[in-house]
């Protein structure tokens, strides 16, 4: 029996849905369609802070394959997993529960595998997780291409040449390490029912799936196989709201860099993943793929020349005081390394 639909932003039709059909490719997009999508995306991110992309061309079978591969990786003995632990130099590799912490008051229950290089040598071995590399690399390439389309759409919307943002993001997932963009595979394991074990109602305050934070980069593309606890604070609000789940869709939201470039016209929403209520949601794991689109390490970018109305009030959650929202230059690598130091144990 299907789980009942929880009250959520998607269920209330409060997240704009953007149709990418007929947009073409990242190399040769349809300019008129890209302009339209850019304006829709700008309107969505400036008013709601997030949007949903449909007809994006990434097959659900590709996502299911990497979800299964991550399950198989998480089932390996710890000594096998340890060979692939995250490299702090390039952010590539396995992040076991507890390594990355956004909420110091709660244990965060998740596994993730960061992919910052498409080299087969950096992936789990074929004999340990068959086809991990064969599944992960094409998906990473698809999400990179989709990110290039989004960058061109945003460029049109803010009044700059589409090549401007492409040039500052030219190194996504290249082997030379000049760009920290990351495809992250995420698995949130099931938790016991609310009346027993850890995460019971009396102890739930000590556990979460992912603590509150805003993403660090330009924007994030997110796929998910179920609702599973994702919540956001809409711009100017202190209220946590469930996002919900639209099968086959990709969520997009701005990161701290895009917020800084646009003087917070396109704000970076604070979000978290909580341990869900209800037996059905708790008994199943949650899988996601997040593609964090970042500028190149040496990109130094001023505020964009927006053709837009005045910015909305800044979000109430603003812990990153080193990020300016004014006409000051911002270095991508410095910002990212600072944020990694704050979140990795």
PLM regions: where:
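C-terminal flanking tails of non-heme Fe-dependent oxygenases
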Residues: 1-103, 133, 137, 144-345
